[in-house]
Regions:
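Sec-dependent N-terminal signal peptides
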Residues: 4-13
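Hydrophobic alpha-helical membrane context
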Residues: 14-15, 254
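Sequence context of c-type cytochrome heme-c attachment sites
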Residues: 16-178
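Short, conserved sequence motifs used for protein processing/export or organelle targeting and
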Residues: 180-181, 186, 190-369
Length: 369
């Protein structure tokens, strides 16, 4: 309770300190800076093509995504109101979800539409205070350091919990109301070798990875789902077990789907779709949206949605009618992801083929005895 009271007093009595850009962290936190540079958090409106195009379709005046995608903007109110636009010459705009922002969150306020990160105000004329989870953190000549209980359980909830639009339609949902950030940190920020600082004064020997591992990491994306195959006469059952603390599908632009093929002597004799993966309704996982009963791709103003999903830490069995199997027949089941589902091309230009190209998450093969 004393710690929480201390942080509230900070908010009431201090004003903003000078912004420390991402690169300034490199001097002491070289390894963490290197990890961060490869993460999604390092990307901004200017380097994330998909995000930029979607944001511009929603509005070419207001940058309503700034709250989470440009949180340290020194003119964030003007960006949200449409009085200003993202500026490539402004470091607080190009730093993405910056180191300084993530380490100056005082607390997270729960709200219906989206949770709110409240930034700590800093003592004017003094070096800034940065927060984290480490016990007895070290100060430096650039900043003071304080262990903040928010970073143990709540820090991810500000941006990664949920988003509901003005029509009370869910845009995305990764966490339920009872969840905290512990499982997020354990999976996406595992402990890796090396201290948090280059000097490692306290010989900690480990630090939380700042790669923020996710769908872009080939090895990491194999770990979230188990695929089990069983065959009964002319019935193929595929059980998907979601081991993650969030649903299989979170982002509205993304699609994940099953590609299933049965082969006999190297010839495909059955598959779950012919041309497009969404032909298999049960094996295609994505959000779809309507606005006043008309299909829309971008959900900013949607009035309803439908989602086929596998909920957090749950299983789903998909059943298919297939030909009778013979000895030696193989069943190949692959779970794929499209970072931008094909429908996105209806409303934005997707020159980056990697966004729509299906990428394998996990594959299993069953051979009939």
């Amino acid at each position: 309770m004393k710690q929480l009271l201390f942080f509230f007093l900070l908010l009431l009595s201090f004003s903003h300190a000078k912004y420390m850009d991402n690169h300034s962290c490199n001097e002491c936190h070289e390894k963490i800076y290197e990890e961060f540079q490869s993460s999604a958090h390092s990307h901004s409106y200017f380097t994330n093509t998909l995000h930029q195009q979607i944001a511009d379709v929603v509005s070419k005046e207001k940058y309503s995504c700034a709250t989470c995608h440009m949180p340290m903007a020194d003119n964030i109110d003007e960006l949200l109101s449409g009085e200003a636009r993202p500026n490539k010459s402004n470091k607080t705009h190009t730093d993405g979800v910056s180191c300084f922002f993530c380490h100056t969150i005082a607390y997270v306020k729960r709200a219906h539409k989206f949770n709110i990160n409240t930034k700590a105000k800093q003592a004017k004329g003094y070096k800034p205070t940065l927060y984290g989870r480490l016990a007895k953190p070290d100060d430096s000549d650039k900043h003071s350091s304080v262990s903040n209980p928010v970073y143990a359980k709540k820090v991810c909830m500000g941006c990664h919990s949920h988003k509901i639009n003005d029509n009370n339609t869910t845009v995305f949902r990764a966490m339920d109301k009872k969840q905290d950030s512990v499982s997020c940190i354990n999976c996406h920020m595992p402990e890796v070798s090396g201290g948090a600082e280059k000097m490692d004064k306290r010989a900690r020997g480990q630090h939380a990875s700042h790669k923020f591992l996710g769908i872009h990491d080939v090895e990491f994306r194999k770990t979230g789902m188990d695929i089990n195959i069983t065959v009964e006469d002319k019935k193929l059952n595929v059980m998907l077990k979601n081991k993650m603390a969030h649903p299989l599908i979170v982002q509205p632009a993304r699609a994940k789907f099953l590609k299933i093929e049965i082969s006999r002597t190297e010839k495909v004799i059955w598959k779950n779709y012919e041309k497009e993966p969404n032909e298999d309704k049960q094996g295609y996982f994505a959000y779809s949206y309507t606005q006043d009963k008309k299909e829309v791709i971008i959900p900013a103003h949607a009035t309803a949605n439908i989602v086929n999903n596998v909920e957090a830490e749950s299983s789903k069995v998909l059943s298919y009618d297939t030909p009778s199997l013979q000895k030696g027949d193989s069943i190949r089941v692959g779970l794929y992801v499209q970072l931008a589902k094909s429908d996105c091309a209806k409303v934005i230009e997707l020159d980056d083929s990697d966004l729509t190209k299906p990428q394998l998450m996990k594959e299993v093969v069953f051979i009939q005895d």
